[in-house]
């Protein structure tokens, strides 16, 4: 049972902080970067809006996440470095596109691969087991392991970016995945990691309030890259922490 009073109070405070961050950024979105984050393309197939909508969802999310990590370190002396570096790095790649800076897709992909490869190697992020014997054998090779983890990240990130476009679709999908991961970790008493998952769920729910059913804010590429990378990391760690659950389950979940 998750009943730590201090952490519950902290999450309640974080919920309020997150809501006001989204509210303030949404209200002043026209002044942020001279309105470059406003979506005024009404002719694209997935456009259901007829007025300028802010693509500041990613910006509000990364600010909320950074505040959570900082405050968590302040109160509990624990900082999630890999989450901070990967999330911020992938956010920046998408944020440049949100600012309408023309970067060729191949350069975006290369940037993502470099950030992820460096993070995977530096933080020793690995997939400890899969339910395929030959893959377990191959993953004993350090270079193959890095490539395989990199592929998993890119699969989730680009999948998130692909389904982003309809109000609430990406947020609801990511919310469902992370809620299932949270339940799994709660049942196995992995409360420290559960704490981080709940913080991400709070950010997703807050964004959903501004995105569905009538959008006042979009994720943008920065938001889909950010939460795609976070969700990939969440799934990898949950797979590693819960050996009794088949790795095929997590593949199907995604």
Stretches found by the model and what they are:
Residues 27-54:
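Cytosolic, membrane-interface loops and tails of multi-pass inner-membrane proteins
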Residues 48, 130, 217:
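Short clusters of hydrophobic/aromatic residues that line enzyme substrate/ligand-binding pockets
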Residues 2-31, 38, 61-89, 170-254:
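Alpha-helical transmembrane segments
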Residues 1-8, 50-51, 136-139:
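Short, Lys/Arg-rich N-terminal segment immediately upstream of the first membrane anchor
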Residues 59-188, 202-212:
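Intramembrane alpha-helical segments
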Residues 53, 58, 135, 222-224:
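Short capping/connector residues at structural and topological boundaries
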Residues 16, 20, 50-51, 55:
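A short N-terminal beta->alpha junction/helix N-cap motif
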């Amino acid at each position: 049972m998750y009943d730590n009073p201090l952490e519950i109070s902290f999450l309640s405070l974080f919920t309020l902080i997150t809501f006001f961050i989204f509210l303030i950024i949404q209200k002043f979105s026209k002044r942020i970067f001279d309105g470059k984050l406003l979506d005024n393309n009404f002719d694209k197939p997935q456009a259901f809006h007829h007025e300028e909508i802010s693509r500041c969802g990613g910006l509000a999310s990364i600010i909320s996440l950074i505040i959570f990590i900082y405050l968590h370190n302040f109160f509990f002396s624990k900082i999630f470095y890999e989450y901070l570096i990967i999330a911020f790095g992938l956010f920046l790649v998408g944020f440049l596109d949100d600012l309408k800076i023309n970067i060729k897709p191949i350069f975006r992909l290369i940037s993502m691969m470099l950030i992820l490869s460096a993070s995977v190697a530096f933080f020793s992020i690995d997939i400890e087991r899969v339910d395929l014997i030959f893959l377990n054998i191959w993953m004993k090779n350090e270079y193959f392991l890095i490539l395989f983890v990199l592929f998993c990240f890119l699969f989730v990130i680009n999948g998130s970016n692909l389904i982003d476009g309809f109000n609430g679709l990406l947020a609801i999908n990511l919310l469902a995945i992370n809620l299932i991961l949270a339940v799994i970790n709660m049942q196995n008493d992995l409360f420290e990691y559960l704490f981080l998952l709940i913080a991400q769920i709070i950010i997703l729910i807050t964004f959903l309030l501004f995105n569905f059913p009538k959008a006042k804010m979009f994720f943008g590429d920065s938001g889909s890259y950010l939460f795609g990378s976070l969700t990939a990391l969440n799934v990898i760690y949950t797979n590693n922490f819960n050996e009794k659950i088949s790795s095929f389950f997590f593949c199907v979940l995604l």
